[in-house]
Curated annotation (Swiss-Prot):
It comes from the Bacteria. GO terms for biological process: translation. Residues 1-24 are annotated as: Disordered. This is Large ribosomal subunit protein bL27. Belongs to the bacterial ribosomal protein bL27 family. Pfam families: Ribosomal_L27. Keywords: Ribonucleoprotein, Ribosomal protein.
């Protein structure tokens, strides 16, 4: 017989690191070319004028300017699009 109580085992105890997703530059903010605007999984926000899309769906500014969000009708649902209006 055992003199000590055996330790139990568990299948829990794991968690993934936060990925820091979300909007990084809001409407009306001034950004420089290359600035990250939104980190996202999938294209919940579509790239518009002067906005590029990375391979992980990150949206970034192609030129210096001011961030502007707009809502567009795409099929049966409304989508958001982000544009950069260039500053002179």
């Amino acid at each position: 017989m055992a003199h000590k109580k055996g330790t139990g085992s568990t299948r829990n105890g794991r968690d993934s690191n936060a990925k820091r997703l979300g909007v990084k530059a809001y409407g009306g903010e001034t950004v420089t070319a290359g600035s990250i605007l939104i980190r996202q999984r999938g294209t919940s926000v579509l790239p518009g004028v002067n906005v590029g899309k990375g391979k992980d769906d990150t949206l970034f500014a192609l030129t210096d300017g001011i961030v502007k969000f707009e809502s567009i009708r795409r099929g049966l649902r409304n989508r958001k699009r982000i544009n950069i209006t260039a500053t002179a």
